[in-house]
């Protein structure tokens, strides 16, 4: 090889190495930016998760409080008001459920009726305000040969099992 050809090859090699250094530098910079954006996204998702868990806890406490109030009014004579509240509650639940399903199209399980999860009493224990409802809207107890005691009813009403699926329960 001649000195001139070697000089040309060295110059060509130097340019290639310089381009590689520039490309590697750009890649490292983009990688740093990508990692920073990914960390920000992860932090935002974590913060949103914490907020949603707090909201879920608050909603579960509110459901507990409302169920306690319903149990406290089982024997009272405020039938019109209770029926109105239950109807409003069912309407609001159906509206929220339909909005939720617009974002997540999944078939609801059969019998997804909030009245069943809010009030669980047998027809003999039914509040007078509910006795006028059509049979398909009567809250039903699970079939059993004996009536549950009030502790069993309260445990069901206040456990996650008595909550709608959207609040962490199976219903």
Curated annotation (Swiss-Prot):
One of its GO terms (biological process) is regulation of transcription by RNA polymerase II. SMART domains: BRLZ. Residues 12-51 are annotated as: Basic motif. Its main location: nucleus. Residues 52-66 are annotated as: Leucine-zipper. It is found in: Nucleus. It comes from the Eukaryota. Disruption phenotype: Sensitive to cold and thermal stress, simultaneous disruption of dph3 suppresses the growth defect during thermal stress. Pfam families: bZIP_1 (PF00170). Keywords: Activator, DNA-binding, Meiosis, Nucleus, Transcription, Transcription regulation. GO terms for molecular function: DNA-binding transcription activator activity, RNA polymerase II-specific; DNA-binding transcription factor activity, RNA polymerase II-specific; double-stranded DNA binding; recombination hotspot binding; RNA polymerase II cis-regulatory region sequence-specific DNA binding; sequence-specific DNA binding. Residues 125-171 are annotated as: Disordered. Residues 143-152 have a biased composition (Low complexity). GO terms for cellular component: atf1-pcr1 complex; mitotic spindle; nucleus. Residues 10-73 form the bZIP domain. Belongs to the bZIP family. Heterodimer of pcr1/mts2 and atf1/mts1. Involved in regulation of gene expression for sexual development. Binds and activates CRE sites (cAMP-response elements, also known as M26 meiotic recombination hotspots). This is Transcription factor pcr1. It comes from Schizosaccharomyces pombe (strain 972 / ATCC 24843) (Fission yeast).
């Amino acid at each position: 090889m001649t000195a001139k050809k070697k000089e040309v090859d060295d110059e060509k090699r130097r340019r290639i190495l310089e381009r590689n250094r520039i490309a590697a530098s750009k890649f490292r910079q983009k990688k740093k930016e990508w990692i920073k954006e990914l960390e920000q996204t992860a932090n935002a998702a974590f913060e949103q998760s914490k907020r949603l868990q707090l909201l879920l806890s608050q909603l579960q406490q509110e459901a507990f409080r409302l169920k306690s109030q319903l149990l406290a009014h089982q024997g009272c004579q405020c039938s019109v008001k209770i029926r109105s509240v239950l109807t409003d509650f069912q309407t609001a639940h159906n509206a929220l459920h339909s909005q939720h399903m617009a974002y997540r199209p999944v078939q609801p399980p059969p019998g997804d009726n909030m009245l069943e999860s809010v009030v669980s009493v047998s027809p003999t224990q039914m509040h007078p305000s509910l006795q006028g409802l059509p049979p398909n809207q009567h809250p039903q107890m699970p079939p059993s040969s004996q009536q549950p005691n009030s502790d069993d009813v309260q445990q069901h009403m206040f456990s996650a099992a008595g909550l709608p699926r959207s609040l962490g329960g199976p219903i």
